């Protein structure tokens, strides 16, 4: 805490509020999928209502705004071509788990999304990544988040506990299993934001009620200074956010969460993805991070596949 001064009104020592740490943005590498085929034609989470019309042009425009924001912040964005009959392919975070050039494929719980895992795997194979085909049900970075050298892994609705063990064998990282108990938070990335994943200064935000009592205790032990978010912001999918260590791309509806972030020295950047929310996803769901843990690690072993993918180019 900063040095204190005498309070002339009381004679007591008055304490200044601790200044938040200086935050630094780190350039990131993302994979995204344009929502050209987005619609809600089935219901596999509480957010989806097949009777509610979707506006594909609006979904594309909102996605484009998210893409362009990443580019303006200095991040690299790769694109995977959307496939007809896979309307949820826009939610790229679910497509795989990627760490230091190694890819563990997604194996989806619901039949409607099973085609996405092989589609994303083909993209990574074409771009020179080392790939592993999952045998257990997992939904990529939707449920697997790298924080401070650990892999936080959600289970309860989609990804299985046996998938956690498989992932540990493939990536050689310690996995911490966390049980999700509220179907509105069916993926870990809907209930928890990685604000800073760096080893030695890892920082998260989460909604405690989305987790089992035991998992809440685990999170408190691992992250005693974590930011806890209230129900209103969580139910606006405010925690389905993307951080580069300084900027936090977040739902405009998560107003209190944005204020909490500012108090911690982060710069919240509201982005409207409300049309995509009809499918149950926000900014993080649309963003698969190609994670690296060291400067020498390969985020993108090959920057151009057979189709010479359009990096940072997603103009309508």
Where are these regions (language model features)?
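The feature marks the mature, well-folded catalytic cores of soluble enzymes
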Residues: 2-316
